[in-house]
Amino acid sequence: MLHVSTIEGQLDAKGLKFALVAGRFNDFITERLVGGAVDYLVRHGGDRADLTIVRVPGAFEIPLAAKKLAASGKYHGIICLGAVIRGSTPHFDFVASECAKGLAHVMLDANVPVGFGVLTVDNLEQAIERAGSKAGNKGVEAASAVLEMVRVLEQI
């Protein structure tokens, strides 16, 4: 049998600092995502004093705040949360796409894990389902992914 070295991240937030960037647009959804992410990090050993929440107008502004936070060197990971709900115009497509691309650039340019917890949904029902209802809480999932990546990168 061939032995292969495996690197995996442990889900332990103790001693780590995280920034959460939350869009205020659709805040009745976003606040559920923030609550889920904060609860997850605390349950996994994080300290509320090591969490910073930055509020921005909406999803389009999230990448700029994330970029500034990543460049500060103060945070081990950044968790980005928001909700873009499709309307009757193409605006949804532009905002969702540019937010995702912007966050990918931040992560790759800064070498800091960035979680994409920005919901891109067709309607309010889907948003509610993904903010702590039937489909779980995507804020929790984004926090988990960032935590795991922080711990993976420590080993590479």
UniProtKB/Swiss-Prot annotation:
Pathways per UniProt: Cofactor biosynthesis; riboflavin biosynthesis; riboflavin from 2-hydroxy-3-oxobutyl phosphate and 5-amino-6-(D-ribitylamino)uracil: step 1/2
InterPro entries named among the record's database cross-references: LS, LS/RS, LS/RS_sf
GO biological process: riboflavin biosynthetic process
NCBIfam families attached to this UniProt entry: lumazine-synth (TIGR00114), PRK00061.1-4 (NF000812)
Pfam family, one: DMRL_synthase
Annotated keywords: Riboflavin biosynthesis, Transferase
This enzyme's EC code(s): 2.5.1.78
Family, per entry: Belongs to the DMRL synthase family.
Role played: Catalyzes the formation of 6,7-dimethyl-8-ribityllumazine by condensation of 5-amino-6-(D-ribitylamino)uracil with 3,4-dihydroxy-2-butanone 4-phosphate. This is the penultimate step in the biosynthesis of riboflavin.
HAMAP family on file: Lumazine_synth (MF_00178)
Enzyme class: transferase
The protein's name in its UniProt record: 6,7-dimethyl-8-ribityllumazine synthase
Chemical reaction(s) catalysed: (2S)-2-hydroxy-3-oxobutyl phosphate + 5-amino-6-(D-ribitylamino)uracil = 6,7-dimethyl-8-(1-D-ribityl)lumazine + phosphate + 2 H2O + H(+)
Chain sites annotated for binding 5-amino-6-(D-ribitylamino)uracil: F25, A59, F60, E61, A83, V84, I85, F116
Binding site for (2S)-2-hydroxy-3-oxobutyl phosphate: S88, T89, R130
Molecular function GO labels: 6,7-dimethyl-8-ribityllumazine synthase activity
Keyword Transferase attached: yes
Domain of life per record: Bacteria
PANTHER family (UniProt xref): 6,7-DIMETHYL-8-RIBITYLLUMAZINE SYNTHASE, 6,7-DIMETHYL-8-RIBITYLLUMAZINE SYNTHASE DMRL SYNTHASE LUMAZINE SYNTHASE
Example of a GO cellular component annotation carried by this entry: cytosol
Active site: H91
